[in-house]
C-alpha cells in the first residue's frame, strides 16, 4: 500500500513531457494604431508554450509585422479583449484564467507603441523575463528548503543553461541542472525522517523534500469570479481589469493526518482557500489580493531571497480573507484548472504538485468562483 501511495504522489516522466510540450494556439493581431500600410497585415499564427512567456514570442511576431510598423522605439505589449496582459505570468496560466471557455486559437492583440505603464511593469524583453523567472525560482527554493542557497550558488553557466532549457522547452536539459537544486519531487513520507533534520540543523545545506520536515509546496492561486447562474462558461463576462482577479501566494504545508492515506487536491484547496470551502460552501458542481505584481526591480544574479522578503511573500498565507481582497460571502467554487486541465478534486495533491508545476517550481492554480446576486434589503 505504501508503494502504491508513492506511485500516486511521485513524479511521472510522461506527465512532465506533456506539460513541457503543451502549447496554446495563438492568433496575434496587430493593433490598428500600429498599422502604417494598406491593406493591413494578416494576423500571425503561432503556438505559445504553456510554460513560456509572451515577451519571448516578440522576435517572431515582430518579423511578421515588420513591414507595416511605424518608426521609433518598440514598447511591445499584448492585450486580450481590452485587458493588458501581465508579461510575467506564464502563457498557459493567462489562457486558463482569462478564457473561461477555451478559445482556439486564442485571439490576442499586440501593440508596439503606447505601453500602459500605469498597469504593466516595464519589460525589457528576454532579460526582464529571465530575471523574473530566476527570482521566482529563488522564492520557491526558500519555501521548499528554508533558504535559496542552492539557487544562489549556481554558476553563471548553469543559470544560462537552465534558462535556455526553459526558453526552448528542453525538459532533458532542464532536468540535468534542476535535479541538483534538490527542489523535488515531493514525497508522501516526507514527515517521518526527523532524525535527519536534527543532523542538518547546524548545516547551511538546503534540505530536500523528503528530508524529514513537512513538505512545503509553493502555490500561486488566481481566483476569478463569474456569474453563479452561468449555464455555459462561454457566456462568462470578460475580465475588465486586474483588480477583479484575486492573486494569492500561499505555500501549502503537507501534514499527514491519521487515517488519511494521501492528501487530495480538495483537501489542499480547503486549506489554501478556506474562505471558499466553509461548511456552507459547495464543492465544484459535477455537471460541468489584488492583481499579481512583478518584482519592483529586476534582481541580478547575485541577489538573494532573504527571510524578510519571503515573509512578505508568505504574508498572504496568514492574512485574513479580507486582507486577500476575497469576499467569500455568496461564492462557491465552480471550476479549478491546472495546466489546462479541469482537475478531479480527489486526485492526490502531491501528484499535482510534482507533475503539473511550472519550471520555476510553482504550482499555478486557476479557480473560478460563482458569485450570487445580492438580495435587496427589505424596503430598499
Curated annotation (Swiss-Prot):
Keyword flag Protein transport: yes
Molecular-function GO term, any one: Atg8-family ligase activity
Post-translational modification: Conjugated to ATG12; which is essential for autophagy.
UniProt cross-link Glycyl lysine isopeptide (Lys-Gly) (interchain with G-Cter in ATG12), position: 138
A GO BP entry: cellular response to nitrogen starvation
Biased composition annotated in UniProt, kind: Polar residues: 194-203
Name of a matching Pfam family: ATG5_UblA
Keyword vocabulary terms for this entry: Autophagy, Cytoplasm, Isopeptide bond, Protein transport, Transport, Ubl conjugation
Compartments (UniProt record): Cytoplasm
Region annotated Disordered, chain positions: 194-215, 283-309
Gene Ontology CC: Atg12-Atg5-Atg16 complex; autophagosome; mitochondria-associated endoplasmic reticulum membrane contact site; phagophore; phagophore assembly site membrane
Origin: domain of life: Eukaryota
Family label: Belongs to the ATG5 family.
Quaternary structure (record): Conjugated to ATG12.
Protein role: Required for autophagy. Conjugation to ATG12 is essential for plant nutrient recycling.
Designated name of the protein: Autophagy protein 5
Amino acid at each position: 500500500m505504501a508503494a502504491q501511495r508513492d506511485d500516486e504522489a511521485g513524479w511521472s516522466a510522461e506527465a512532465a513531457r506533456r506539460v513541457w510540450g503543451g502549447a496554446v494556439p495563438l492568433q496575434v493581431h496587430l493593433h490598428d494604431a500600429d498599422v502604417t500600410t494598406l491593406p493591413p497585415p494578416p494576423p500571425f499564427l503561432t503556438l505559445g508554450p504553456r510554460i513560456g512567456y509572451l515577451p519571448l514570442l516578440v522576435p517572431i511576431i515582430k518579423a511578421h509585422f515588420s513591414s507595416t510598423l511605424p518608426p521609433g522605439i518598440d514598447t511591445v505589449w499584448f492585450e486580450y479583449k481590452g485587458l493588458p496582459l501581465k508579461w510575467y505570468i506564464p502563457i498557459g496560466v493567462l489562457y486558463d484564467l482569462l478564457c473561461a471557455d477555451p478559445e482556439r486559437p486564442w485571439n490576442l492583440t499586440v501593440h508596439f507603441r503606447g505601453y500602459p505603464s500605469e498597469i504593466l511593469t516595464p519589460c525589457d524583453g528576454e532579460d526582464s523575463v529571465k530575471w523574473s523567472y530566476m527570482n521566482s525560482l529563488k522564492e520557491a527554493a526558500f519555501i521548499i528548503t528554508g533558504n535559496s542557497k542552492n539557487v544562489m550558488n549556481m554558476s553563471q553557466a548553469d543559470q544560462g543553461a537552465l534558462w535556455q532549457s526553459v526558453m526552448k522547452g528542453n525538459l532533458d536539459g532542464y532536468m540535468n541542472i534542476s535535479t541538483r537544486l534538490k527542489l523535488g519531487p515531493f514525497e508522501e513520507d516526507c514527515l517521518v525522517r526527523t532524525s535527519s533534520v536534527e543532523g542538518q540543523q547546524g548545516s547551511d545545506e538546503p534540505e530536500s523534500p523528503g528530508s524529514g520536515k513537512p513538505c512545503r509546496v509553493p502555490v500561486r492561486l488566481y481566483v476569478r469570479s463569474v456569474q453563479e447562474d452561468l449555464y455555459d462558461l462561454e457566456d462568462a463576462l470578460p475580465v475588465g481589469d486586474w483588480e477583479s482577479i484575486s492573486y494569492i501566494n500561499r505555500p501549502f504545508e503537507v501534514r499527514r493526518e491519521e487515517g488519511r492515506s494521501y492528501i487530495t487536491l480538495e483537501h489542499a484547496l480547503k486549506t489554501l482557500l478556506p474562505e471558499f470551502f466553509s461548511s456552507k460552501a459547495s464543492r465544484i458542481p459535477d455537471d460541468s489580493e489584488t492583481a499579481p505584481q512583478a518584482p519592483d526591480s529586476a534582481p541580478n544574479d547575485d541577489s538573494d531571497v532573504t527571510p524578510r522578503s519571503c515573509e512578505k511573500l508568505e504574508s498572504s498565507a496568514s492574512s485574513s480573507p479580507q486582507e486577500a481582497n476575497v469576499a467569500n460571502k455568496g461564492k462557491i467554487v465552480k471550476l479549478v484548472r491546472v495546466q489546462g486541465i479541469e482537475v478531479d478534486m480527489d486526485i492526490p495533491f502531491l501528484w499535482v504538485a510534482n507533475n503539473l508545476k511550472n519550471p520555476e517550481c510553482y504550482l499555478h492554480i486557476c479557480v473560478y468562483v460563482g458569485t450570487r446576486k445580492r438580495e435587496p434589503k427589505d424596503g430598499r
